[in-house]
């Protein structure tokens, strides 16, 4: 939450309006500069510093570093998302090599098109693509951590956690308006990860990671 507020403060100082459609951000040139500066710089390095303080050897990366993640700019359809990337290639061997060396990659939600341009990329997509790539080398559990205890039936009731959800239930909840906004791409990424060999996906609060709480996606 501090990260999101921090980014919002930068938007305001720069006179930039943040626009979202269906839980996905519209990224113009000015927005891309801010996202790259904040998420590729300040936020990423603060996370790395925090992990180092805990004795965890972490390395902060964007998709451009060592050609980790290549994307294509999303084509204009009903909505023009601007400088947003759809991931096309992940350097799975690089990620696996870092982990084998005891290095924890900290990935910013930024990719590149291999033509010299950075692209804003949904953070859940980054996590999902990394998990899918690593599933070729390891047994992977993908965990999405955010401010809620899991996927909620009632967004105003933090205790209304849906313990398990499959594709059929997901589609029904979306149609009924129970699941909306940013939770939709989060769950879409979850199902794609499972299809690609990820063992399981858990959506929960960071504080509940080791408690077995949250929503299991299968």
Give short role names for the model-derived ranges.
Residues 1-11:
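Single conserved hydrophobic/aromatic residue that forms the stacking wall/gate
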Residues 12-106:
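Ligand-binding beta-strand-loop-alpha-helix segment within the catalytic cores
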Residues 29-56, 109-114, 118-133, 161-210:
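Polyanion-binding loop/helix "lid" in catalytic or ligand-binding cores
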Residues 59-62, 68-69, 135-152, 201-205:
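Glycine-rich phosphate/pyrophosphate-binding loops
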Residues 80-98, 112-116, 124-135:
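Anionic-ligand binding region
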Residues 97-118, 146-167:
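Active-site rim beta-loop-alpha module in soluble metabolic enzymes
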Residues 102-106, 141, 200:
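Residue-level preference for the first positions of well-ordered beta-strands
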Residues 209-218:
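Short, basic/aromatic-enriched C-terminal tail that caps enzymatic domains
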